[in-house]
Structures are given as structure tokens and as C-alpha cells.
Regions:
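Beta->alpha loop/short-helix hinge microenvironment recognizer with preference
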Residues: 1-278
Length: 278
């Protein structure tokens, strides 16, 4: 008797959307090669024609064929599994202290630079890291307290529009050169906003050259208080931190549960706005 896992034969709504609009995506949007590869893998995920593994019971003789999965983070099925595995791995590396969830955002007028040149995304990590280390080091220049932190890049917002920003899980404390641990619960928001703006704009000017100077000057003029940084206390004990990692580290772009309907042309999905959580 041969059985095939039923769920693997049924395509999810995201697969249907991309199958129906595949040619439009290829010839209208002209996506990058890596995007096409992940879409192809996601579309064919669980398709028995692409192979699988056969399992058999030595007692009753029942055979079960399990189609191979795509293992793409873009896939709502495989991406969720990746997130769970990644969360478990990272949880063992966390310091057993309170953490804080911070978000570093950029001016909307800067977003297109990162869309046109993906290598610039690395500057976001550099800027955030330098700001965090400087904030802790200046508490004691001799000890140079160093915190533990995880940085995750998101290139989209809840509305799925291009919006590169950094999520940071930061320990509320750091270890000094002498091995001394010092707790730190007060984060200077003014410093974080201004320092992040300065660090990022300087890095971008260094990378893009003198042509970026006008944009840089405009950002200083329009954002005199710096770029928005969310860093309010949120009581992230180690258990909560693990949940944050699962939520922000390697999760699929959109869960199928957020897609309300698809009629072959239009997709309706829901999300909660950061501004009012509505």
C-alpha cells in the first residue's frame, strides 16, 4: 500500500499567487537572479515530480512517499521551520540577562539608495554596531563595557513595502576589560538617534562619494533630532528574547494566515500598523 502525504500535494495560497503571475513577475519586474531562484523553489516545494523519500513499515508493509521540500526562507512552510531551528540555535548563545528590543530606521528618501545597490545594506549593520559599542564604551573608557547583541536586517515593513531597517536584541549590560559585568538600563535616546544618523550618513558618503553630500545635508536639515530609533524598555527576559528571535530572525516575508483572499487578480492581506497597532 502506497501513501503520499496529503498536505504536500496541496499548494498553498502563496504558491497559487506566484504560479498565476509568474510571467508578469519575470518580464515586468525583472527580479534579481536570487529572487527568481527562491520563487522557483517555493512554487515547486512539495511537488512529488521533483522527487522525495520513500518510507516503509517492516511489519505491515505500508509505504509512504514524502516529497522533498525547498528549504527556502521565502517559503511559508520551510521558512517557518528555518525560523524555529535558527531560534533554537541562537537561544543557546544568549547571555542570561534582560535584553531590549530596539529598531533603527532610516529616512524614507534614503531607501532607494539601498534598493538600487544592495551592497549598501551592509552599512546599516556597521552604523548600528558602532553606535551601540560607543554608547557602552563611553560609560567607562577604561573598562570599555561591551554588550551582547543580535542584529537582523528587514528590507520590508508590515505593509510589505521597501523599508530597510535593523532590529536589534541588546543586552541591558556589558562586560568590561577586567571581566566586570555592569548593568545598563538607561539608554540615551537622543544619542542613539543622532549617532545613528551621523554614522550612517558618513558611511554612505564614503561609499557613494561627493554626489551624496546634498542628500546628506538635507537629511541633517530635515532630521535635526536624528533618525527614529525605538529603544524603550520592554522587559525582554531570556524566554521572551527567544520569542523575539523567532519573530524577527529568518521568518517568511508574509504568513499565509495574513492573506485574507485571492481572486486570481487581487490579493487582500492584513497587518497591524506600528503607529497605532490597528
Amino acid at each position: 500500500m502506497l501513501q503520499t502525504l496529503h498536505n504536500n500535494l496541496m499548494s498553498n495560497i502563496l504558491q497559487d499567487i506566484f504560479k498565476d503571475n509568474y510571467e508578469r513577475m519575470i518580464y515586468t519586474l525583472h527580479p534579481r537572479k536570487s529572487v527568481i531562484e527562491n520563487v522557483d523553489r517555493m512554487i515547486n516545494c512539495g511537488d512529488p515530480s521533483f522527487g522525495g523519500a520513500m518510507y516503509g513499515c517492516g511489519k505491515c508493509g505500508t509505504l509512504k512517499f514524502v516529497p522533498f521540500r525547498c528549504h527556502s526562507r521565502f517559503c511559508p512552510t520551510c521558512g517557518t521551520k528555518y525560523s524555529i531551528d535558527r531560534t533554537t540555535s541562537m537561544s543557546f548563545k544568549l547571555i542570561n540577562v534582560q535584553h531590549r528590543h530596539c529598531v533603527f530606521t532610516i529616512d524614507s528618501e534614503l531607501r532607494h539608495f539601498f534598493l538600487e545597490d544592495r551592497e549598501l545594506l551592509g552599512l546599516l549593520f556597521e552604523a548600528v554596531q558602532s553606535v551601540i559599542l560607543r554608547m557602552f564604551h563611553k560609560d567607562n573608557k577604561t573598562e570599555k563595557f561591551t554588550p551582547g547583541f543580535i542584529l537582523v536586517l528587514h528590507t520590508f515593513g508590515r505593509d510589505l513595502k521597501w523599508n530597510p531597517h535593523i532590529h536589534c536584541l541588546l543586552s541591558e549590560g556589558g562586560i568590561g576589560n577586567s571581566g566586570l559585568w555592569r548593568a545598563k538600563t538607561h539608554f540615551n535616546y537622543t544619542y542613539l538617534r543622532n549617532a545613528f544618523r551621523t554614522a550612517l550618513l558618513n558611511l554612505m558618503e564614503k561609499k557613494l562619494g561627493s554626489s551624496f553630500k546634498k542628500v546628506k545635508a538635507k537629511c541633517y536639515k530635515e532630521h535635526k533630532e536624528g533618525f527614529y530609533v525605538y529603544a524603550k524598555p520592554n522587559k525582554c527576559n531570556p524566554t521572551v528574547v527567544a520569542k523575539y528571535i523567532g519573530r524577527y530572525l529568518g521568518r517568511p516575508v508574509i504568513a499565509t494566515s495574513r492573506i485574507d483572499s485571492y481572486d486570481g487578480e487581487n490579493v487582500t492581506f492584513h497587518y497591524n500598523r506600528h503607529e497605532d497597532d490597528q
